Amino acid sequence: MYKMQLLSCIALTLVLVANSAPTTSSSTKETQQQLEQLLLDLRLLLNGVNNYENPQLSRMLTFKFYTPKKATELTHLQCLPEELKLLEEVLYLAPNKNFHLTDIKELMSNINVTLLKLKGSETRFKCEYDDETATITEFLNKWITFCQSIFSTLT
């Protein structure tokens, strides 16, 4: 008889403890910080590309990039590294007084490190790409929007 009351008491205690626990775990906060860093780096790249003094912009817009279909989850970030090498090569066409090669290299390195942290060692994800290609500005804007969307679901 007392055994049942004791088990009920333990169950209620566990429910109370679980409900009063903080809702944002440290891993979620870390993911948010990494997404913020990725967003910042992607925006800096976009600003460098869209710089009104960039004489190579029209040439850069001729290169086409692939974006994933319906990117809605954090795992879709695994599709980004596949296009980063081309992105880096295209960005090297555009160095100017406001967007130096060292800046490009540093931003690309930051993005690669951040992506590695965010996606972890998971490599089984198969990317499905959209049939339509994107220009460099569309590509960066889509990834910025994706990161903002994921970030908003974490907050």
Curated annotation (Swiss-Prot):
Keywords: Adaptive immunity, Cytokine, Disulfide bond, Glycoprotein, Growth factor, Immunity, Secreted, Signal. It is found in: Secreted. Residues 1-20 form the signal peptide. The keyword Repeat does not apply. Cytokine produced by activated CD4-positive helper T-cells and to a lesser extend activated CD8-positive T-cells and natural killer (NK) cells that plays pivotal roles in the immune response and tolerance. Binds to a receptor complex composed of either the high-affinity trimeric IL-2R (IL2RA/CD25, IL2RB/CD122 and IL2RG/CD132) or the low-affinity dimeric IL-2R (IL2RB and IL2RG). Interaction with the receptor leads to oligomerization and conformation changes in the IL-2R subunits resulting in downstream signaling starting with phosphorylation of JAK1 and JAK3. GO terms for cellular component: extracellular space. The gene is IL2. GO terms for molecular function: cytokine activity; growth factor activity; interleukin-2 receptor binding. Disulfide bonds join 79-127. This is Interleukin-2.
